[in-house]
């Protein structure tokens, strides 16, 4: 952990300036934290915690931490605030995170199976219901005799989307201990749960069209009167690939 002051992005620092959940670190600060570009960092100002994606390592050590204006505005993090920064993002157990508005991590894994991974990176209040859906699927598969693992994050607090909805945790190394554990092997199938502000449910991903179509047909046969399901990538804004 390092203690630093928050600075604005410099002029022309497009990788950080207009992005949410974005920051950059000086070479010295990055070295002390042992982080690289695309890693995540946890920032605490004494009242709250939030997560940022390190978009780049900038040049001057005089400015150890630069945080985008969108991130500061959305989370109430002040320019020139004194903060502590660390590499490990999850802060507390699930129940304590829920009580205090923090972030927790869940991993259920036998350290060896490579058949199925269930993945919910924005659970809790961040994308409400996604971790619950992931856990239900995990238990259903386990009870049906399938080997599977689960990794999920649970962010809490009414402002959890602004504080914890950071993109691409899968590109990080050492930021989420549970994710590091399940990332040490290749799976036959990975199922990821997300929420979108659209009027349909998209079955996306890199798996072939016939598989996605089969999933949509099965879901449609069960609850066709309540939801619209789509499987063609061209019909979805977020394709998940």
Model region roles, listed by residue range:
Residues 1-32:
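Autoprocessing Asn-cyclization modules and mimics
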Residues 4, 49-53:
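Small-residue-enriched segments and motifs
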Residues 16-18, 34-36, 111-113:
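Short, surface-exposed loop/turn motifs at beta-strand boundaries within globular domains
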Residues 27-33, 44-46, 147:
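Serine-hydrolase catalytic machinery in alpha/beta-hydrolase-like enzymes
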Residues 27-28, 53-60, 64-241:
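N-terminal catalytic or cofactor-binding beta/alpha core of small enzyme domains
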Residues 36-48, 81-87:
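Short conserved beta-strand and strand-loop elements enriched in small hydrophobics
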């Amino acid at each position: 952990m390092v203690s630093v002051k928050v600075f604005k992005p410099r002029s022309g620092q497009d990788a950080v300036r207009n992005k949410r959940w974005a920051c950059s670190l000086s070479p010295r600060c990055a070295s002390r934290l042992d982080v690289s570009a695309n890693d995540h960092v946890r920032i605490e100002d004494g009242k709250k915690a939030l997560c940022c994606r390190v978009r780049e390592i900038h040049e001057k050590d005089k400015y150890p931490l630069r945080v985008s204006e969108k991130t500061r505005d959305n989370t109430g993090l002040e320019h020139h605030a004194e903060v502590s920064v660390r590499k490990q993002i999850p802060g507390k157990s699930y129940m304590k995170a829920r009580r205090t508005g923090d972030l927790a991590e869940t991993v259920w894994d036998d350290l060896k199976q490579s058949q199925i991974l269930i993945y919910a990176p924005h659970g809790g209040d961040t994308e409400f219901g996604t971790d619950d859906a992931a856990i239900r699927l995990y238990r259903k598969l386990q009870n049906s005799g399938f080997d599977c693992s689960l990794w999920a994050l649970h962010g809490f607090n009414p402002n959890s989307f602004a504080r914890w909805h950071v993109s691409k945790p899968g590109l990080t190394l050492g930021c989420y201990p549970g994710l590091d554990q399940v990332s040490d092997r290749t799976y036959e199938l990975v199922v990821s749960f997300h929420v979108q502000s659209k009027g349909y449910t998209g079955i996306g991903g890199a798996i072939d069209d016939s598989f996605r179509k089969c999933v949509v047909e099965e879901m449609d046969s069960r609850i066709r009167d309540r939801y619209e399901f789509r499987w063609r990538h061209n019909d979805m804004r977020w394709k998940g690939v």
